[in-house]
From Swiss-Prot:
Primary role: Formation of pseudouridine at positions 38, 39 and 40 in the anticodon stem and loop of transfer RNAs.
Protein name per UniProt: tRNA pseudouridine synthase A
Gene: truA
Organism: Mannheimia succiniciproducens (strain KCTC 0769BP / MBEL55E)
Gene3D superfamilies xref list: Pseudouridine synthase I, catalytic domain, C-terminal subdomain, Pseudouridine synthase I, catalytic domain, N-terminal subdomain
Active-site residues, record numbering mapped to chain: D51
Length: 263
């Protein structure tokens, strides 16, 4: 049988999602817990491999198993064997043609900035603190230049292994909630560090160092060296993965928990 899971995790203590030799990863912890519940070795496949320090509230994985368990056992049983910073949010049996990565039609991220002269002791790791006074309206205006299908070479990490820099951004919204500025971005897929590189450059616009039209110019240059530094990992969340409706996967609040679902 094939099972899909919705996964939430705090990426602070992990060297990214992907299982690797001699480093702590979310995938390795999840596979260990699932293998215990299934009483056999389990390998999971995810919708998106997040980097070191990046969080997830809407990660989706699938795995195949010979073990027959009710859906609630995959959720509650696995959670009982996971560390506190990883949790299963839902479990569902899926058809054989489902694949967490290749069946996905879109991914959605939220980047959370805490704008204050002084740092927070309550939320030190799930946000990116900045002393800059960001203008979310200018950031929103700049973001519209990135909508649609474009070559995102200017926002692509040098080590990116994707065959193409072309991606299609469905929406990019910048919202303020008190001292929090949230960049909410959805696309068919993302090149390596794309969200963090976009956020870093939007911050240059938000603080007044660059005009909104600078983002349009950057996009046209197709040169990563001209853009702003990459924003820190700690403020980034994978909040949603979209699939065709016929798979009937559960819909959960996007999160993170301290933000309203709809922004």
């Amino acid at each position: 049988m094939k099972i899909a899971l919705g996964i939430e995790y705090n990426g602070k203590n992990y060297f990214g999602w992907q299982r690797q030799e001699k480093v702590h990863s979310v995938q390795a912890e999840l596979e260990k817990a699932l293998s215990f519940v299934a009483n056999e070795k389990i390998e999971v496949f995810c919708a998106g491999r997040t980097d070191s320090g990046v969080h997830g509230t809407g990660q989706v994985v699938h795995f195949e198993t010979n073990a027959i368990r009710p859906e609630k056992a995959w959720a509650f049983g696995t959670n009982a064997n996971l560390p506190d910073d990883i949790a299963v949010r839902w479990a569902k049996e899926v058809p054989d043609d489902f694949h967490a990565r290749f069946s996905a039609t879109a991914r959605r991220y939220r980047y959370v900035l805490y704008c204050n002269k002084l740092r927070s002791a309550i939320l030190p790791y799930g946000i990116t603190h900045t002393h800059l006074d960001l203008d979310e309206h200018k950031m929103q205006e700049a973001g519209r230049f990135l909508l649609g299908e474009n070559d995102f070479s200017s926002f692509r990490a040098a080590q990116c292994q994707s065959n193409t820099p072309w991606r299609n951004i469905h929406h990019l919204n910048v919202i303020r909630r008190g001292n929090f500025v949230i960049v909410d971005i959805k696309a068919n897929a993302f090149v390596h560090h794309m969200v963090r590189n976009i956020v870093g450059s939007l911050m240059e616009v938000g603080c007044g160092n660059q005009p909104p039209e600078w983002i349009e110019w950057l996009l046209a240059q197709k040169n990563r060296k001209l853009a702003a530094p990459t924003a820190k990992a700690e403020g980034l969340y994978l909040v949603q993965v979209t699939y065709p409706e016929h798979f009937e996967l559960p819909q959960m609040p996007l999160g993170p928990l301290f933000l309203a679902d709809e922004l």
